[in-house]
Every structure is written in C-alpha cells, then in structure tokens.
Amino acid sequence: MEKIFERLMYASRWIMAPIYLGLSLVLLGLGIKFFQEIFHVLPIIFEMREVDLVLVTLSLIDITLVGGLIVMVMFSGYENFVSQLDVGEDSEKLSWLGKLDSGSLKNKVAASIVAISSIHLLKIFMNVENISNDKIMWYLLIHITFVLSAFAMGYLDKITRK
C-alpha cells in the first residue's frame, strides 16, 4: 500500500506539466502585445514627443522582462519539479538549464520582480506631474518592499547554503 501511495505521489508531479505549458500561451500573449505596441507606435513615431517614446520603450522593456521571467519559471520549474528537459545533443541548450534549484529560481524571480517594479517606478517618475503624491508614495513603498524582500530572500538563501 505504501509503495502504491508513494508512486502515486511521485507521478502527481506531472499535474504541473500542463501548467508550465500554459505559461507558454501567456508568453505568446506577451509577444502579441509587444508587437501590437510597436505597430501602434511606428506610424506616429515622427510626431511623438521624446518622453512618450521613452515611456513606450519602458513598456516594451517591461514586457521583455516579464517574458524572460516566464521562460525562466517555465523551464526551471519543469526541470526542478517534473522532468529533465531532453532537447537533444544537436540543438542549442540554455547554459543555465539544469543549474537553477528552487532557491536560485526564487532569487532570480525576486530580482526580476524588482527590475519590473523599477521600470514601473521609472514610468511613474516620467509622468510625475499627473500623479498624486499619495500614489507616488504607495508606489515607492511597494517597490521598497519588493527590494527588501528580494534582499532578505537572497540573504536567507546564502546563510542556509553554508
């Protein structure tokens, strides 16, 4: 009975596989939004103010960072919790694949969240005259919370690895 239960528990990790595959659909959606933004900007690029172009660029960087985060979670999560990726000898293999444990993944996710939050904060500062001081304060507090959380997670990971 115990062996059956343990095998069932071990096999249940495959429930995560479609979830990781679903993240690729989110990645596709981000790609669509990325190019939608580019196609929206191209016809009016010569009439745009520099500030508006910088804001669009920050939005595109934001989408790119989120996409990278999705790829990292998708591949690393699959390898850590479901099965090792076998992409073949003749195809490109990402250098970090198979090297990120769950602790490293959490730290990379936290760093990505801080980077994404920084982009949002920069967009807020680019439009500071249209945003109330209370909202700016809340954005800053949330960003500082992300930074401190990422720092704490990294520190805890460092002391537990010793």
Swiss-Prot record:
Transmembrane regions: 15-35, 53-73, 136-156
Keyword terms, alphabetized: Cell membrane, Membrane, Transmembrane, Transmembrane helix
Keyword Signal on entry: no
Primary site of residence: membrane
Localization, UniProt: Cell membrane
Membrane topology reported for the UniProt record: Multi-pass membrane protein
Keyword Repeat among record annotations: no
GO cellular component entries: plasma membrane
Family under the similarity heading: Belongs to the UPF0114 family.
Protein name: UPF0114 protein Sputw3181_3501
Protein species of origin: Shewanella sp. (strain W3-18-1)
